[in-house]
Regions:
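CBM-like, beta-strand-rich accessory domains located in the C-terminal region of large
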Residues: 1-163
Length: 163
């Protein structure tokens, strides 16, 4: 066990996590927040996800902000939002802020971001007992001075071929 080797969890988790799931006009909406970056960086993180009724489009927004009552951080902070892909996925960058994700079953999804720079980078997949496997991740980078909203969307290129 990794925890036993390092004497605890390798990364300290947040103290407060709040989530709410709702149905809004037939769309599943999840809103979640945590304070995992508060002590070290002075930021709270919130994510809002909206899934279409057909399951062919996922809209998201990640919000980084200081606690209420604080207008600005002492300095601008760089951030990186990571989306790790399964090792069987292939990914190619298209125009700026957009990439194409190809699944092993032939499905194709388009990922688009506003408010951050998109890059495709190497990653490791640790989920199964076979050990780590190389994979890819989408990384959204930018700088925040106090409050930043990064909006992104993932949708099926051909919704009628969803399995």
């Amino acid at each position: 066990q990794l925890e036993a080797m390092v004497g605890g969890l390798p990364i300290r988790g947040p103290d407060a996590v709040v989530s709410e799931l709702a149905d809004e006009a037939g769309q599943a909406v999840l809103h979640a927040t945590h304070d995992g970056y508060l002590k070290r960086f002075g930021l709270l993180h919130a994510r809002r996800l909206r899934l279409s009724p057909a399951g062919d489009k996922l809209d998201g927004v990640d919000i980084l902000e200081p606690p209420k009552g604080k207008l600005r951080l002492k300095q601008d902070l760089p951030y990186a939002i990571h989306f790790h892909l399964h090792p069987d996925c292939r990914c190619t960058e298209r125009e700026r802020g957009t990439c194409k994700i190809m699944l092993s079953d032939g499905q194709v999804w388009i990922f688009n971001v506003e408010g951050a720079a998109l890059s495709i980078e190497e990653s490791l997949f640790f989920v199964d007992s076979a050990g780590p496997r190389p994979g890819l991740q989408l990384v959204l980078r930018g700088t925040t001075f106090g409050e930043t909203a990064v909006r992104w969307t993932m949708h099926a290129e051909n919704p009628h071929v969803l399995v």
